[in-house]
């Protein structure tokens, strides 16, 4: 009878971390590995996999944590600019970090790679997205197992069957109610749909149902064990909320850095990708957010906010210049990453507004 060992046993035998063993299991790097309940079991005869992170005897290539989904308004292209604009005092006078509208988390992950905060708060009005964050934090191994199954099933199909498979999973995602018992399944479907849909969009109709069409990808890679495990470790002490951005007022104080990355004000009728939830973000909402920005500023919090620059299309549009007249407004160059017309992607100016 074949005997098995736990990840802990394998870690001791191979002189690597238990977390690394879990990643190798999730990536199918260990022959004969299986899932029992919510834990991996490994054949006692299994050999330690060759470390693919090493390159010809040089130092291991260590990739930084990066977003697990493609997200409209993602800040990957702006990370250097954002970091150059951080306030002084992080780690001393600034010990807390808050990010409502966290989205894909590019800035969050980059920030946590370089800085340590005593308390961290993230939120978003998209309950499905925040469920994924919670599952990565609390049930990463189960999530990786579910993603591995979806990835293998999809990649083994013809393009015609992949399309049918996509719409079956989209229907399942829209049908399942988000409960404790379905949280992992919904999170895995969320990531699958994001990576196999058209252009990486998240869009819902007026009934709140996800309605992005099939993206015709011949293969997908959604079971990134190393990245998700790294993110899981980062999120262990993070407060994760699915709520309106106003909730952060209870968390923010004079020792807090708050970064707002709300749905951008569209530059024209066709450029708005604000339907991440069933509620659009109007000019009235932008004005309300500006008032809240001022409220947090009056509490002593250090506040940064990104948004579109209307002067890209109308030099006389002073909407944000007037709203944030009392604060520091910078115009920075960014890349448009998601657009319904791929040919219209390119460089564009964005606003970065700070109270310091």
Locate predicted features.
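Conserved Class I SAM-dependent methyltransferase catalytic core
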Residues: 286-335
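Class I S-adenosyl-L-methionine-dependent methyltransferase module
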Residues: 114-236, 274
């Amino acid at each position: 009878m074949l005997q098995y060992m736990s990840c802990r046993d394998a870690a001791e035998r191979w002189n690597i971390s238990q977390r690394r063993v879990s990643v190798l299991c999730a990536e199918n790097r260990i022959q004969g590995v299986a899932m029992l309940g919510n834990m991996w079991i490994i054949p006692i005869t299994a050999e330690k996999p060759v470390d693919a992170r090493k390159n010809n005897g040089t130092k291991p290539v260590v990739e930084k944590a990066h977003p697990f989904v493609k997200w409209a308004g993602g800040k990957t292209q702006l990370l250097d600019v954002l970091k150059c604009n951080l306030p002084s005092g992080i780690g001393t006078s600034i010990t807390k970090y808050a990010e409502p509208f966290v989205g894909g988390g590019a800035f969050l992950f980059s920030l946590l790679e370089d800085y340590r905060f005593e308390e961290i708060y993230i939120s978003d009005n998209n309950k499905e997205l925040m469920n994924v964050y919670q599952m990565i934090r609390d049930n990463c191994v189960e999530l990786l197992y579910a993603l591995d199954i979806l990835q293998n099933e999809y990649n083994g199909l013809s393009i015609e069957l992949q399309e049918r498979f996509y719409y079956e999973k989209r229907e399942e995602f829209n049908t399942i109610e988000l409960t404790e018992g379905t949280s992992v399944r919904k999170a895995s479907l969320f990531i699958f749909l994001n990576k196999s849909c058209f252009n990486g969009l998240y869009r819902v109709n007026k009934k709140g149902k996800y309605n992005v069409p099939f993206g015709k990808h011949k293969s997908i890679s959604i079971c990134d064990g190393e990245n998700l495990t790294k993110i899981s470790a980062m999120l262990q002490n993070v407060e994760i909320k699915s709520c309106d951005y106003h909730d952060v007022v209870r968390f923010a104080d004079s020792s807090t850095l708050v970064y707002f990355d709300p749905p951008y004000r569209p530059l024209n009728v066709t450029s708005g990708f604000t339907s991440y939830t069933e509620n659009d973000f109007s000019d009235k909402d932008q004005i309300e957010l500006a008032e809240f920005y001022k409220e947090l500023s009056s509490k002593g919090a250090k506040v940064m906010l990104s948004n579109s620059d209307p002067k890209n299309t109308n030099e006389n549009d002073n909407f944000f210049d007037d709203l944030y007249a009392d604060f520091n407004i910078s115009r920075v160059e960014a890349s448009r990453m998601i657009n319904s017309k791929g040919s219209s992607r390119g460089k564009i100016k964005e606003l970065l507004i700070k109270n310091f």
